[in-house]
């Protein structure tokens, strides 16, 4: 009975920890949309949202009310079940990666032995949301956007996986906490700089962030694969994009920048500050870079990212052998 009570306490504590982290990430993703709009306004020397509340502080509430009260319309010509399922997959696929990321040495929900492989699996799953959304909408622009997203994601996931193999080889483990502990004396970004560079580029592509947002380019495809979505279904796609930004930023910090490791201040503060830096970098990239052509995006991946990733693997193998 004592054993059963101890297990029930552990399960209950883990359950509330999962709920707390997931709610925190969803709320942070919603807030990130307002932060991005304000920062883009600063970069472009214009006013951002500043009408609702003090300095636009209540703009998020206004946006949520607008989305909740919009008509939740399903096109009569769509494949309804898949049409409804797609935003749910987009919202949950990379959100499920958050529980395997250690926030501190003592605060991790699930410390998987195959944490890296689990992330790659969930990143691959996210492309199905876009494929299903474009196909089930029965709209030519949505289908073109879905086709672009599939080719782009499948191409850059090759580099996403290969860029992490150097980190895995150097730390000797697929377990994310072991990778963080292996950076006690030197961060992986120094011996694995080319791997970090490729992972950052591939992470932008997997998140479909600028300059890799061809699947939803407004000027060419009229918002691409979610052209037929409205209301909360569109909101799930919208929040899912920001969840993917937080997830990829957390993984960059964990795998290449020592995770929670840092001097003087508490480890959780270090982890959050590093994540904020890379989120700011994602927004700065959107503000600074133009959108290239679709064929240029694919050629850049195969002609630049693939050789760079292979060079990083050979260099890592050489350093390990020496």
From Swiss-Prot:
GO molecular function: NADH dehydrogenase activity; oxidoreductase activity, acting on NAD(P)H, quinone or similar compound as acceptor; quinone binding
Cell compartment(s), UniProt: Cell membrane
Entry-linked NCBIfam families: PRK06076.1-1, PRK06076.1-2
Gene from which the chain derives: nuoH
Major site of localization recorded for this protein: membrane
Key words of the record: Cell membrane, Membrane, NAD, Quinone, Translocase, Transmembrane, Transmembrane helix, Ubiquinone
Transmembrane feature ranges: 15-35, 50-69, 81-101, 114-134, 149-169, 186-206, 237-257, 265-285, 302-322
Keyword Manganese attributed: no
Pfam families (alphabetical): NADHdh
Family: Belongs to the complex I subunit 1 family.
Protein name as it appears in the record: NADH-quinone oxidoreductase subunit H
Chemical reaction(s) catalysed: a quinone + NADH + 5 H(+)(in) = a quinol + NAD(+) + 4 H(+)(out)
A cellular component annotation (GO) from this entry: plasma membrane
Assembly and interaction partners: NDH-1 is composed of 13 different subunits. Subunits NuoA, H, J, K, L, M, N constitute the membrane sector of the complex.
EC number: 7.1.1.-
Function summary: NDH-1 shuttles electrons from NADH, via FMN and iron-sulfur (Fe-S) centers, to quinones in the respiratory chain. The immediate electron acceptor for the enzyme in this species is believed to be ubiquinone. Couples the redox reaction to proton translocation (for every two electrons transferred, four hydrogen ions are translocated across the cytoplasmic membrane), and thus conserves the redox energy in a proton gradient. This subunit may bind ubiquinone.
Membrane topology: Multi-pass membrane protein
Upper lineage: Bacteria, Pseudomonadati, Pseudomonadota, Gammaproteobacteria, Enterobacterales
HAMAP family: NDH1_NuoH
